[in-house]
């Protein structure tokens, strides 16, 4: 089958592959076409970095799928950033990178603005202007990411299955915004969501403040069936 590999320069390479090919094999094919050594290649599909020993089938890569090729800098290193949800992000960095640079890389991967990020290493909060070298952060070190909410608050959303979702919101957020956050976490389209608080169904254009929803309030999520009324 054919797949496509898109580089950061916007160039697209076409490769002939089998679903049983490993990621190593694919990197070798890219080397044959483009001359880029496999150890400088990082391949991304559906937001995930692909591991060398796995196959295209493992990642459900079908014909005409597009992979993204990112170059791994020589002299660079990888570090890990662990979030409070337990998710671990891998970043390619240099020891000379500042903490600001690292926060920008996290924003690129996760969409979290730098001014909402606090990074902790060895129990210390890291200051923006300092470098990784200043804090003796070596390859494969793990930083911890804590979110700094701007006047924000947390609320809970309980589903009919009994699952509770935690959301970071502002009192000025509209019900539409909240439904979009639920979609981001749970994949449920906003038009299938009905939110209930204090026995009332919440209307899209209104804000949390309109309904006097405070921090740590619990909303109830009911699904609106497709084709329903």
From Swiss-Prot:
There is a cross-link at residue 76 (Glycyl lysine isopeptide (Gly-Lys) (interchain with K-? in acceptor proteins)). For the sake of clarity sequence features are annotated only for the first chain, and are not repeated for each of the following chains. It is found in: Cytoplasm; Nucleus. Residues 1-76, 77-152, 153-228 form the Ubiquitin-like domain. Keywords: Cytoplasm, Isopeptide bond, Nucleus, Repeat, Ubl conjugation. GO terms for cellular component: cytoplasm; nucleus. This is Polyubiquitin. Ubiquitin exists either covalently attached to another protein, or free (unanchored). When covalently bound, it is conjugated to target proteins via an isopeptide bond either as a monomer (monoubiquitin), a polymer linked via different Lys residues of the ubiquitin (polyubiquitin chains) or a linear polymer linked via the initiator Met of the ubiquitin (linear polyubiquitin chains). Polyubiquitin chains, when attached to a target protein, have different functions depending on the Lys residue of the ubiquitin that is linked: Lys-48-linked is involved in protein degradation via the proteasome. Residues 229 form a propeptide. There is a cross-link at residue 48 (Glycyl lysine isopeptide (Lys-Gly) (interchain with G-Cter in ubiquitin)). The keyword Cell inner membrane does not apply. Pfam families: ubiquitin (PF00240). Belongs to the ubiquitin family.
């Amino acid at each position: 089958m054919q797949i496509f590999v898109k580089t950061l320069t916007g160039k697209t390479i076409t490769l002939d592959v089998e679903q049983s090919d490993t990621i190593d094999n694919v990197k070798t094919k890219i080397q044959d076409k483009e001359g880029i050594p496999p150890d400088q290649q990082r391949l991304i599909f559906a937001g995930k970095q692909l591991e060398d020993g796995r196959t295209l089938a493992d990642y459900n890569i079908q014909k005409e799928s597009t992979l993204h090729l990112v170059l791994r800098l020589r002299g660079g290193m990888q570090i890990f950033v662990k979030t409070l949800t337990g998710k671990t992000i891998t970043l390619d960095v240099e020891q000379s990178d500042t903490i600001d640079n690292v926060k920008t890389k996290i924003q690129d991967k996760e969409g979290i603005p730098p001014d909402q990020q606090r990074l902790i290493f060895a129990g210390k909060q890291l200051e923006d202007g300092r470098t990784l070298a200043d804090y003796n952060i070596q390859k494969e070190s793990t930083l911890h990411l804590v979110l700094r909410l701007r006047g924000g608050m947390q609320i809970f959303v309980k589903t009919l299955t009994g699952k509770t979702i935690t959301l970071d919101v502002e009192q000025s957020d509209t019900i539409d915004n909240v439904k979009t956050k639920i979609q981001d976490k749970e994949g449920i389209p906003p038009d299938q969501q009905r939110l209930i608080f204090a026995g009332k169904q919440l209307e899209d254009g209104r804000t949390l403040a309109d309904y006097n929803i405070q921090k740590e309030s619990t909303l109830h999520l009911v699904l609106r069936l497709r084709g329903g009324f």
